[in-house]
Amino acid sequence: MNWLFKKIGLVARQSKPEVVESLLLLSHHLESQGLHVFIDRDSVTRSQAQGLTLIDRSDFGKIVDVAIVLGGDGTMLSVARLLAPYRVPLIGINQGRLGFMTDIPLHQMLDSVSAILSGEFLPEERMLLQSTVVRDGVEIAHHLAFNDIVINRGAMGQMIEFEVFVDNQFVYSQRSDGLIISTPTGSTAYSLASGGPILHPTVPAISLVPICPQSLNNRPIAINDSSEVEFMLTRGIDARVHFDGQAHCDLMELDRVLVRRYRNSLKILHPLGYSYFDMLRQKLHWGERLL
């Protein structure tokens, strides 16, 4: 078989033995096909690592042609942020819960992966967000987000007050539990639970979704993905900004969070026959067609 990708990186969630078992099965299968397999060092234990080629996850972008994630969307998020700067595509094997991004079921893993690696796939470009936290004119933090950037109240439980600007134009001031700045990928996550819209992955938009606003006039809005969003905390003693729920930065009053689309997109490779709407219908338990 002619392979389009020959150097394959594998990542799994080590805390789940059944996931690691699937990773080892896939690794042996790919190596038997003559492919070079590199496994994330943190995905297996020392006893499981015998005979495997281990590398740090942070080195994947420099070495592999494609990365395969076995687990849930949380694992996919962390790997996506690492690989986006290198434009390395991702394949997701679902061994988590919902699996909006890890769409290949376990029982189809070997056949689907082999087909994709040989060039039979549907590519899908997904945008990321880049953010900068500014305090007293100094940039104190930089992060990427694949799903969303969330600014919210902390453990004190008090509402925060903030102002939002888009391309230096004032949009609104708000008193609420926080704000979700979401990509189309993240529109089916926290944003959706907070009343935000579902955005198709190809829609060039960023959504701004209030979290429990004091005024019911504050509604979600979608803006062009070429825009820059500026969030300024005007009142809040215990506020924090989260990046994909996996990194955070504590905020002080008058801190600003600047958000824009990241320069690179991330390519996800789906099996032939994949449909975004089929996935939504399955994950969200929508009704089937009547005719």
UniProtKB/Swiss-Prot annotation:
Enzyme Commission code: 2.7.1.23
Keywords carried by this UniProt record: ATP-binding, Cytoplasm, Kinase, NAD, NADP, Nucleotide-binding, Transferase
Entry-linked InterPro entries: ATP-NAD_kinase_N, ATP-NAD_kinase_PpnK-typ_C, NAD/diacylglycerol_kinase_sf, NADK
Catalytic function, reaction form: NAD(+) + ATP = ADP + NADP(+) + H(+)
One GO molecular-function entry: NAD+ kinase activity
Enzyme class: transferase
Principal place of residence: cytoplasm
Superkingdom as given in the UniProt entry: Bacteria
SUPFAM superfamilies: NAD kinase/diacylglycerol kinase-like (SSF111331)
Active site: D73 (proton acceptor)
Cited Pfam families: NAD_kinase, NAD_kinase_C
GO biological process, one term: NAD metabolic process
Cofactor(s) in the UniProt record: a divalent metal cation
Compartments, as annotated in UniProt: Cytoplasm
Any one annotated GO CC term: cytoplasm
Family per record: Belongs to the NAD kinase family.
PANTHER family linked to this entry: NAD KINASE (PTHR20275:SF0)
Function summary: Involved in the regulation of the intracellular balance of NAD and NADP, and is a key enzyme in the biosynthesis of NADP. Catalyzes specifically the phosphorylation on 2'-hydroxyl of the adenosine moiety of NAD to yield NADP.
Name the record gives this protein: NAD kinase
Native source organism of the sequence: Laribacter hongkongensis (strain HLHK9)
Origin organism lineage: Bacteria, Pseudomonadati, Pseudomonadota, Betaproteobacteria, Neisseriales
Gene from which the chain derives: nadK
